[in-house]
Amino acid sequence: MKEELAVYFIAGTQDIVRGTLPSVLEEALKGGITCFQYREKGAGSLQTASERKEMALECQKLCAKYQVPFIINDDVVLALEIGADGIHVGQNDEEIHQVITSCAGKMKIGLSVHSVSEAEEAERLGAVDYIGVGPIFPTISKADAEPESGTEILKEIRRAGIKLPIVGIGGINEANIAEVLAAGADGVSVISAITRADDYQLVIANLI
């Protein structure tokens, strides 16, 4: 699992500033991303279930072509319906116990955490495969993001003995990735670092 978290790309149609989500995703896959999470939320996102399913299937097909895990954000019904490789939920999304009941043994389960206590609870659950920790730095990609925590939260979680794989998220780019990994993350999640790049593959090469 840790290797799959190395460069974890997250995006939905609302994040794309040039081209289409499938075209940007394929460039990112060619560049070497190790995981993709389809996250359709916020202003500019697809609004109907049928539109989201159609887009999810197109992205899933691309991920399969490049043998990269395809994760769905906060939509258990869709994830189960299309046979996604994983589901990722936040603290305020679908109740994690319900997600575990529905998805454990069928796909990977990721959970966002913002504190040591939330990380400890994720590990106690026994069915969470990895945790997303952040936002580490200020981010423009999530209007409802928690206040940034800096890399210290990663160090605190590791000092607490948490063994779950960790992917850092929030404002991570080529300039600060080394700091995030040194603090204890196994990989990084990025949105705008890729979607707003002039050269997707160059950015990814600098993140690997």
Curated annotation (Swiss-Prot):
Which molecular-function annotations from GO does this UniProt entry contain? magnesium ion binding; thiamine-phosphate diphosphorylase activity
Q: In which pathway does it act?
A: Cofactor biosynthesis; thiamine diphosphate biosynthesis; thiamine phosphate from 4-amino-2-methyl-5-diphosphomethylpyrimidine and 4-methyl-5-(2-phosphoethyl)-thiazole: step 1/1
Note the InterPro entries from the entry.
Aldolase_TIM, ThiamineP_synth_sf, ThiamineP_synth_TenI, TMP_synthase
Please provide the Gene Ontology terms (biological process) for this protein. Answer: thiamine biosynthetic process; thiamine diphosphate biosynthetic process
Please provide one cellular component term from the Gene Ontology annotations of this protein: cytoplasm
Q: Does the keyword Acetylation apply?
A: no
Q: What is its EC number?
A: 2.5.1.3
Q: How is the cofactor bound?
A: Binds 1 Mg(2+) ion per subunit.
**UniProt binding sites for Mg(2+):** 74, 93
Reported cofactor(s): Mg(2+)
Residues at which 4-amino-2-methyl-5-(diphosphooxymethyl)pyrimidine binds: 37-41, 73, 112, 142
Q: Show the catalytic activity.
A: 2-[(2R,5Z)-2-carboxy-4-methylthiazol-5(2H)-ylidene]ethyl phosphate + 4-amino-2-methyl-5-(diphosphooxymethyl)pyrimidine + 2 H(+) = thiamine phosphate + CO2 + diphosphate; 2-(2-carboxy-4-methylthiazol-5-yl)ethyl phosphate + 4-amino-2-methyl-5-(diphosphooxymethyl)pyrimidine + 2 H(+) = thiamine phosphate + CO2 + diphosphate; 4-methyl-5-(2-phosphooxyethyl)-thiazole + 4-amino-2-methyl-5-(diphosphooxymethyl)pyrimidine + H(+) = thiamine phosphate + diphosphate
Q: Which Pfam families match?
A: TMP-TENI (PF02581)
Primary role: Condenses 4-methyl-5-(beta-hydroxyethyl)thiazole monophosphate (THZ-P) and 2-methyl-4-amino-5-hydroxymethyl pyrimidine pyrophosphate (HMP-PP) to form thiamine monophosphate (TMP).
Entries under NCBIfam families matching the protein = thiE
Which family would the database say this protein is a member of? Belongs to the thiamine-phosphate synthase family.
For this entry, the protein name equals Thiamine-phosphate synthase
